[in-house]
């Protein structure tokens, strides 16, 4: 199979999986990204031109705001990918886990730590020019999924992600990077629409950020989970099975 056909096949599977699982993924995304949307809205209200400080301090404030906005746009994606991994890989004979069951299985501390460190290394990569941020973004994109799928430690998740991506860097990059860019573009469009309908206050920004992330984050997370499973299978010959469609709810038989 050529690289192009393999890549197109991955995108087709992402689309099919997203459509099949949207009824359960979108509420899960709402739980994660509505609170984070408020933080995004606050950070996007920063206006360095209004600060009564010297140009040096204004530049520092601008750089700080840039880092904060970059971090806020990425934070939550790794955590959400871990939650999606639980939902998409439950045993075939079992019903899909409920929100409460997913909440009970999530490794909160490890995923939050992985999420924070992932954002940190990308922010550090910004100071090493964009190439550094791009490399870190791709090599560690699978960290959250492997932490949940294989119960790694925080550092073990980063190491495992690097191992899986190594040798497949451009394949992974060709999936996660365009999805991140397109997702950001859609998110910006939703925020703009929200401002045009609701004004320019923090409520409009919060609504736009939340809705944009709820719509786009599942695409990225589904892609991460599918790539993780594919690369596990390629490397070791086996991987957790992807549950392609939610099982229909079967009514209990009468006694």
What is the predicted role of each segment?
Residues 33, 39-41, 86, 234:
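Hydrophobic alpha-helical segments of integral membrane proteins
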Residues 62, 66, 70, 77, ...:
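A conserved helix-loop-strand patch within extracytoplasmic ligand-binding domains
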Residues 2-35, 101-125, 136-188:
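Interfacial aromatic "cap" segments that immediately flank transmembrane helices
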Residues 4-8, 60-65, 73, 77, ...:
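Solvent-exposed, acidic/flexible segments
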Residues 1, 13, 49-53, 80-95, ...:
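Juxtamembrane transition segments at transmembrane-helix termini in multipass membrane proteins
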Residues 35-73, 98, 103-105, 126-133, ...:
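Membrane-helix interface segments in multi-pass membrane proteins
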Residues 74, 130, 147-151:
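Short helix-coil transition sites and intra-membrane helix breaks within transmembrane domains
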